[in-house]
Amino acid sequence: MPSPPAMLLGGLLLIVASTTVAQRRGQEAAGRRRAHRVQHGQCSYTFVLPEPEPCPPEPEAFGGSNSLQRDSPAATLNLGDWPSQRMRQLEKMLENNTQWLQKLERYIQVNLRLELAQAQQHMVQNQTATMLELGTSLLTQTTAQTRKLTDVEAQVLNQTSRMEIQLLETSLSTNKLEKQLLLQGHELHRLQGHNSALETRVQALETQQQAELASLSGEKERLRRLLGRQSGALAGLERTLRAASSNSSLLQRQQHQLLESVQRLVRVMAQGPASMRAADQLFQDCAEIQRFGANASGIYTIHVANVTEPRKVFCDMEASGGGWTLIQRRENGSVNFQRNWKDYKQGFGNPAGEHWLGNEVVHQLTSRATYSLRVELQDWEGNEAYAQYEHFQLGSEAQLYRLSLSGYSGSAGRQSSLVLQGTNFSTRDADNDNCLCKCAQMLSGGWWFDACGLSNLNGIYYPARHHVRKLNGIRWHYFQGPSYSLRTTRMMVRPSGI
């Protein structure tokens, strides 16, 4: 709705416009105008005041339009005063208009000043409220940010504390491992010294044994000569006794004594050391050595048919009746079992420690007679188990040393961890298994893998505390599971029926 000053200004403009319309012709003739300008802030108001058109004298003043008048000096004088009177009237009207405009300007200025002050006050109040709202918002945001920073600081402190604790634990673990490593180093040096002492003792025992063998050989030769002399003496005595037997009881008693002496001598010769008698014999396996009288477990030499050179083997004369020929042993990881086909064919390692006798030797042994196989196992907790097969045979190299087993028994599982029939031997350079994945390369070692199978006693040797979850370790599935690497293993054979 328009304000009162605006309405008053509009009314004044309407009056001025009406006057202007009535007197437009006079204005155009005169060509003179008056303007009044009002300035208010950035806005200005300009009022144009036209000059009023002079009114001509009425016709009656000159005596009528249709009558002839005489020239009169008085009439002429009145007509000459009319413009000046009209000018005074217009000036007075202009002065009045000017006064009205000034009053209007003052009224507008006063009212506009009040409205401007009110608007400014309202604006200040709005700005103050806005600033208060902004301040409150900023304070709220600052509080929230401070809270977040406090939370982040607490999290950083917690994380720092955890990291310090982890660092301390890591440091303690490192110190513990260093101490364990130092202790293991000392233990290793001690074992090396002990091993050197044992080697020296073994060498001394070998030297002593060789000396005893030489002494026994000399004793044997001396006994042979003595036996020859005794035989000659007995022959002479027999002749003498025949001559005097009819009438000499004394000679009969002497003859009886001599016969007893000879019998004792023969028994002494028959009870000589088994090792001295075994030196002149050739044995094909440890069972023959045991039958000949040797009952001590150790290293012996055997001569296997169709094998050109004699082989040193370890004979177990105690387990399950003895007479076992070892074909494999794992105990400390000192021998690398990551070998090729040729190595597994010929054999490798030391018979007194870790070794593989050789597929060709085992094939020749098991092809001339029926053999049994015994597998002995021990885990890292000291538990022992065995698996025994009454019939064991290994095919030739042309047959890829194919495994044939039957008659399973033992404590190493409810069933065999070896495939009983038709499994070929595989190595890293000879993939003969029934899997596309090349089990020998994936699981390591040489073995009868089949389709990677349930066992592999020639896998990687893992020490204590590193022996679990090892698929490529020394495994026997039905004893300790598919990924438990065992501590020791032995495989040995002997003729069936013993």
From Swiss-Prot:
Entry annotated with the keyword Coiled coil: yes
Locations listed in the record: Secreted
CDD domains in UniProt: FReD
Alphabetical list of SMART domains matching this protein: FBG
GO molecular function annotations of the record: receptor tyrosine kinase binding
Fibrinogen C-terminal domain sequence ranges: 277-497
Gene Ontology annotations for the cellular component aspect, listed alphabetically: collagen-containing extracellular matrix; extracellular space
Glycosylation sites: 96, 126, 158, 247, 295, 306, 332, 424
Matching InterPro entries: FIB_ANG-like (IPR037579), Fibrinogen-like_C (IPR036056), Fibrinogen_a/b/g_C_1 (IPR014716), Fibrinogen_a/b/g_C_dom (IPR002181), Fibrinogen_CS (IPR020837)
Disordered as annotated region, ranges: 51-80
Annotated protein name in UniProt: Angiopoietin-4
